[in-house]
Structures are given as C-alpha cells and as structure tokens.
Amino acid sequence: MEKHDLLYEGKAKKIYRTDEEGLLWVEYKNSATAFNGEKKASIEGKARLNNEISSLIFSYLKEQGVDSHFVKRLSETEQLIHQVTIIPLEVVVRNVIAGSLAKRIGIEEGTPLEKPLVEFYYKDDDLGDPLVTEDHIAILQAATKEQVDILKVKAIEVNDALTTFFAGIGVKLVDFKLEFGVTADGAILLADEISPDTCRLWDAKTGERFDKDLFRRNLGNLQDGYEQILTRIEQKA
C-alpha cells in the first residue's frame, strides 16, 4: 500500500489517495481549532492522540456491530479508511446538557437528559454549521428522509455502545458529534473520527474535563486530557 497525492486537507486531517481503489490514507494533524476555526493552535502530540484514540474506538465499535469507514491503523498518526461520500450533516447526540444546548435553552450545564437527544447541524463553514430540522434537511437536499431515519438509528446505536465503553473507564459521555458517509454501493458508514475532539468527556466522579473544551474554554492542558483518555482505554484493553 502506497500513499499518493493529497486529496483533501481539513482542520484536523489530511486525506491522500492510495494505489488501491476505494481506500484512502488519513494523516492526523497537530492543529487544534475552535469556534469554526476562529481560535487556532498547534499542539504537539495531538495527531498521535486523536489517531490512536479514534482507531481504538472504531475497532471497539466494529466488535459491537457498528460499521465504519475505518480499516486499520497504519502508524501513530495515520490510518486507512474506506472512501465514502460524506453526508453534509453533523449528527450530535447529547446525554447531558452542555455547551451550546445549555446556552440555547437556558438549563444549567451538567443536567442529565432523561433520554438521548439527537440533533442535526448542516456542514457549511460559511453558515457556521447551523442547527437544522428534518424539514430544513429536506429543503437543503442534504439527505433523504430514509437516510435521516438511518442516521438517527445509527446515532443511538453508537451512543449505547460508547456510553458503556466510556463508563468502563470511569468517564461520562456527555455528548458527541458523528459524521456519516455513503459508499459507492449506497451503504451508510460511520465516518470521520471519534476522539476528545468530537466528544465531551468528563471524569465520572470528579467532573474533570478530558476533551476539546480544555482548549476551547481555556480550562487546562489539552494534551494532558487526551493522554488521560488514551491511557485509560489502553489499560482497559
């Protein structure tokens, strides 16, 4: 397997073509961003941490019957994935009120939800990735009704699996963002990454933050928080 030309570069990853049809080479970056790219920094070791954590979580989800684009870990900062066409929606699952939801509805951060809340955000940097309803999604033609129904089911399946996974390492899964893609034959796969960049992760006993809020809100050292998550996962394995 060889890495060929750069296909796409985003805020946190570079994606390259390979010499095998349908497979892409992902290289994680040390960059950290928040507030739609308004806050930026380069953090040594972040690429390794996100790649290692995401690789381990995707492998766990596969064991739980959740299909994703992840094929295998290639190095500390690289992984191999199936090529998919990304559905332009971020699917956010919330178990505890935090972040923008707390501001939007005026309920104190940290309040548990009686059942998981699934939200959709339209992936458009110029618009600031706005919260959208299913009717908005239809108007935007971002996904079909059938696809939206599938995304909701898959999001709850992932939430059930990850809630158990993180509880096993003493971490509360507050909320998280998922992305999905469509394969050439029409299958919908979990895509992007699952890491402290995309999840709010609090220590189950102390409430200590181990996620990107450390950077976003200047709450502490991001590298230390992510390292704590990786260490706990590796100790459990």
UniProtKB/Swiss-Prot annotation:
Pathway(s): Purine metabolism; IMP biosynthesis via de novo pathway; 5-amino-1-(5-phospho-D-ribosyl)imidazole-4-carboxamide from 5-amino-1-(5-phospho-D-ribosyl)imidazole-4-carboxylate: step 1/2
Enzyme class: ligase
Reaction(s) the record says it catalyses: 5-amino-1-(5-phospho-D-ribosyl)imidazole-4-carboxylate + L-aspartate + ATP = (2S)-2-[5-amino-1-(5-phospho-beta-D-ribosyl)imidazole-4-carboxamido]succinate + ADP + phosphate + 2 H(+)
A molecular-function term among this protein's GO annotations: phosphoribosylaminoimidazolesuccinocarboxamide synthase activity
EC number: 6.3.2.6
InterPro entries, alphabetized: SAICAR_synt/ADE2_N, SAICAR_synt_PurC, SAICAR_synth, SAICAR_synthetase, SAICAR_synthetase_CS
Keywords linked to the UniProt accession: ATP-binding, Ligase, Nucleotide-binding, Purine biosynthesis
Gene Ontology biological-process annotations: 'de novo' IMP biosynthetic process; cobalamin biosynthetic process
SUPFAM superfamilies, alphabetized: SAICAR synthase-like
Family: Belongs to the SAICAR synthetase family.
Protein's name according to its UniProt entry: Phosphoribosylaminoimidazole-succinocarboxamide synthase
Lineage per the UniProt record: Bacteria, Bacillati, Bacillota, Bacilli, Bacillales
